[in-house]
Amino acid sequence: IHSVYFVGIKGVAMTSLALYFYSKGVRVSGSDVKDRFPTDEMLSKFHISVLEGFTPAHIDTLKNVDLLIYTGAHDGKNNPEVVRALSLGIPVLPHGKALGFCMEDSKQISVAGSHGKTTTSAMIATVLSHAGKFPSYAVGCGEIFPLGSPGACGTGELFVAEAD
């Protein structure tokens, strides 16, 4: 995979997965609403292009996109950009399946529950990183301050994910 487009990229889970791909050297771009999000600064920090709104024209202008990942928000699979990508034969995955795809060759640590998922996932990723385990991680937050990003592809065998 050389290029991934995210529909709803500003959501915390989507941003963390986008940054995972970015850290692998994959070209990342996406679209979302104009509203300010806690992830705006992180996307800007890594120079990830975010188009405003959702229109089939965004998909028509993409060059060599290998995969489109969409969120359940913004009409999910019925989003006009997702519909256009499908009509052009671009592979499309919802966020959860895309995260599973990224994790499938790793030893997986998924944090689930009703309270504390983000904090616990971030703590696990931080401890493993500082212990020299070089984990991959995708945590739904604006930033994991000790690590500098809510998502990254590490060189170790572990993948830490916040499970929704």
Predicted regions span which residues?
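Phosphate-binding loop of NTP-binding sites
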Residues: 20, 59-61, 76-164
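N-terminal leader/targeting and accessory segments in enzymes
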Residues: 1-98
